[in-house]
UniProtKB/Swiss-Prot annotation:
It is found in: Cytoplasm. The keyword Hydrolase applies. Heterooligomer composed of large and small subunits. Its main location: cytoplasm. The keyword Metal-binding does not apply. Signal peptide: none annotated. One of its GO terms (biological process) is DNA catabolic process. GO terms for molecular function: exodeoxyribonuclease VII activity. Pfam families: Exonuc_VII_S (PF02609). HAMAP family: Exonuc_7_S (MF_00337). This is Exodeoxyribonuclease 7 small subunit. Bidirectionally degrades single-stranded DNA into large acid-insoluble oligonucleotides, which are then degraded further into small acid-soluble oligonucleotides.
């Protein structure tokens, strides 16, 4: 029986692993069993990412007094960015 996969260490790590899983599955080189295992891992990673984003949104709402405010980012002529 395969050992359960560990939780990702960060949102970025989860996204990177998801990208790897997508590439592996799109290659068509996986057995059905391996493809199903990777799909299952991907579903878990997706859930982790959604929960992380939801938590970040809740923290932003608290910082903005309960109202979600659109953040506009302007790009300067030199390519740098600033919040407007």
């Amino acid at each position: 029986m395969p050992k359960p996969a560990s939780s990702p260490t960060s949102f970025e790590a989860a996204v990177a692993e998801l990208e790897t899983i997508v590439q592996q599955m799109e290659s068509g080189q996986l057995s059905l069993e391996d493809a199903l295992a990777r799909y299952q891992r991907g579903v878990g990673l997706l859930k982790f990412c959604q929960e992380t984003l939801s938590g970040a949104e809740q923290r932003i709402r608290q910082l903005e007094g309960g109202e979600l405010v659109e953040l506009r980012i302007d790009t300067n002529a030199d390519g740098s960015q600033e919040c407007a």
